[in-house]
């Protein structure tokens, strides 16, 4: 069986609220860590979310 191209990653809030999103990432084309600016409902503002491994 072939290795999956897309993997799931956890996007953790940089505001240290403990809130996170789960996103899909193409591991072949996006080799660097994913960073997105999204809404954090705990902090109630838009902050950067950085990629972390799903445990």
Curated annotation (Swiss-Prot):
User: Could you tell me which cysteines form disulfide bridges?
Assistant: none
Question: One of this protein's Pfam families, by short name?
Answer: Ribosomal_L33
Q: Which UniProt keywords apply?
A: Ribonucleoprotein, Ribosomal protein
Q: Name one GO molecular function term.
A: structural constituent of ribosome
Return the similarity comment: Belongs to the bacterial ribosomal protein bL33 family.
| One GO CC term, this protein | cytosolic large ribosomal subunit
Set out the biological process GO terms recorded for this chain's protein. translation
Q: Which InterPro entries match?
A: Ribosomal_bL33, Ribosomal_bL33_sf, Ribosomal_zn-bd
**Identification of the protein by name:** Large ribosomal subunit protein bL33
């Amino acid at each position: 069986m072939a290795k999956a191209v897309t993997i799931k990653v956890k996007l953790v809030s940089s505001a240290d609220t403990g809130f996170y999103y789960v996103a899909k990432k193409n591991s072949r084309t996006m080799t660097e860590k994913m960073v997105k600016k999204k809404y954090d409902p705990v902090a109630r503002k838009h902050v950067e979310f950085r990629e972390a491994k799903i445990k």
